[in-house]
Each structure stands twice: as C-alpha cells, then as structure tokens.
Amino acid sequence: MSTIQYDMLYLLSCGVNKTKPQQNILEQYKSDDRKLMQLYWFSKQHFVDALTGTGLKQAGVTLPDPWEKDMAKAVRKVILFDAERARILSFMEQRGIWYLPLKGIILKEFYPSVGMRQMSDNDILFDEAFAEQVREYMVSLGYEVISFGKGNHDVYEKEPVYNFELHRALYGAAHDNNWEQYYRDVKERLIREEGSSYGYHMKPEDFYIYIMCHGYKHYQGGGTGIRTLLDFYVYLESLHSEMDFAYIEKECETLGLSEFEKRNRALCRKVFGDNAFAELPAEERVPDTAAHTTKEIITKALSQEELDMLQYYMTSGVYGTFDRRIENNVKKYSKNGGSSKIRYVIKRIFPGMETYQYYPFFYKHKWLLPVCWLYRLLRVVFQRERRERILREADAVRKVKV
C-alpha cells in the first residue's frame, strides 16, 4: 500500500469522526496536483470519493473538477433515490405488501451528511407473494426489468440513476445453506416501523449481523473494498452502547461468522477509530517528514494478520475483482484434497441445482438438464462475449497458486 492510500484511510477517519485533518497532511495535497489526483483515484476506486472530498474541501483544499462533480452527483443521487423509494414504498403500503429497507438505505443515515455514503442501488426485501404486482408497478413507472424470478432478487433500472434490487429473500439456494435457513423466516424477527402498517426494520444487533454476513459473502467471493470496513465502524460507533454483543457472538457462531466478525470489529476501530491517529506529529513538523506518518501509525497499530486483512480490502476495489473471485472459488475446492482446479472446472461445466434457477425452464424440467449443458456450451461457442469471458476465466484459474 502506498502512503497516499494510508492518507486516504486517515481522511476517512476524519470524515466519519467529524475532525479536521492536520494541516501538515493537507499541505501535501494542496501543493501537489499529481498526489491529489492519485488520492481521488484511490477514493473513487473504493466509492468513498464524496467522503474524502468533503473533508478536503472543508479544510480548504481546492479539488479538481471531476472530484467536485462526483460529490455533487453523490448528493443528487441520494435525493433522487430517497424520493423514488418513498414512491415505491407508498405503493407497497397501499397494496398491503410488507417490506424491509436494507444495506445502504440504512447505513447512509449513520454518516455525517447527505451523500457521504455513496451507493449504486437500493435494496429492499419484500413479500415475494406480490412479486408480479410489484413488477407491473415498476414497469408502469418506466423501469426496465433486468432480472425477474432468478435467484433471490429482482432487478429494475431506470434513467438517470435508478437501480432497485427487490429481494424475495435475503439469501437463496446459490448462497450458504446455513444462511438461507437462518434468514428464511426473517420477518418473524422484524420490528414494525412506527407510523407504518407494512414497513419493518431489524433490531440493531440483527442489522449488524446481516451486514457482517453480507460483507463476508463478498469478502470470500470476489473481495470487497474499504467501504465495507468503514460501514462496520460507522454502525458500531453509533450503536455500540445499545447492542448486546453476547447475542451477536452467539448468532455469528451459528452463521459461521464468529472469527470474521471479531477480526473486523477490532480492525475497523484500529483503522478508523477516533483515536486511531492520535500519535500524528504536531503541526510544526515539516511536511516532507509528515508524509509517512499515517502509514507508520497504522502499520504500528496492526498485527501482521490485520495488515494482511487491510491489504485485502484495499486491493479489492468496492465490489471485488474478477481474478480474486476465481482464486477464492478455486481454493474452496482444495479443502477436501484432490486437484482444486480440476474440481472447479467440473463444477463450472456441471453446476449444482442452484445455478439452474437462472434457467427456469430447465429448473422445472430437470430431466432435460443434459440439453441445458449443451445449450450453455453452444452459447460459449457462438457468442463472442461469453467466449472471451471464459478465456479470461481460464487464464485466472491457471494463475491461481494452490
């Protein structure tokens, strides 16, 4: 990790803790446009450029135009999503459809100001018995149906920015079976929103467990970026005193998340905590020397295992990477011995039944699965895009060290 990336972590800590960055850190970016653009690029890669940009701007740093525009777009996007979501939830209220806003819809409220917590979509769990009615309504609003009846959520998109993932279930057959069973009857654990007939929310502990579970899903898949760790910190910092950690630890143990939760709880506080950078040198220290202080402080505070975990977050980008997803999937097959690469290839050619949910006809008529295998093969042969993706996947598998 570069010193600029460590500075980014420091600025994120300042942003969520509402503290002004030290002047000797700011001077580096006021006087060096190249470093400022690198900081922007790293922040944008992790979808936290609105947060770092706001802190810099409030401290007197002049931002490049693209950064200013991204910050304005982040605020506008939240405002547009909030209004559109209110309309959709009003429809659900009128039709007697229970619903549960998820993920960023909730988390953004724990950040200091509008637009600081950026997101590309809105996720809502709803009563799947009304999926057809909801689809008709979304189409009437001008949405394109990107996906319907495949997996555990339906996807709707509309210009200029709208992307709604409407979940029939929190987890489905393609996910960990333990998670799918745990969340199958999630409505029984929900709390009705005050002033609403059909809107619900999770109690703080359950929401924390859910975002930890969601974070782990991405972490062990293609990876997930530093925003995930920041979300953990912001939520913990806001509600820590109210939460029952004995309950959290018990439920995380049930879900197989115990070690992941404990490591992240410690790591996020060490990286973003209010006192994480208390050892930064005094303002009179010269800028050239101060350039390395954020890196020194973090590397000193973390164990090697924690540094490795932080590095994993920092090299994953906001939604993970293709190569990392392939690597993690291949390594899953090494646990039981044998050639993990061969087992991975066989699984890709002859996938489990969860995959066939994306082929409704074959999922319904399972005796025709051999035809589906041939269909999948022919698509690779005759569709250039799929062929290129398979070649890229094969190259990624080849590079995996097991």
Name these PLM-found stretches.
Residues 1-120, 126-402:
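Conserved NTP-donor binding/palm subdomain of two-metal-ion nucleotidyltransferases/polymerases, i.e.
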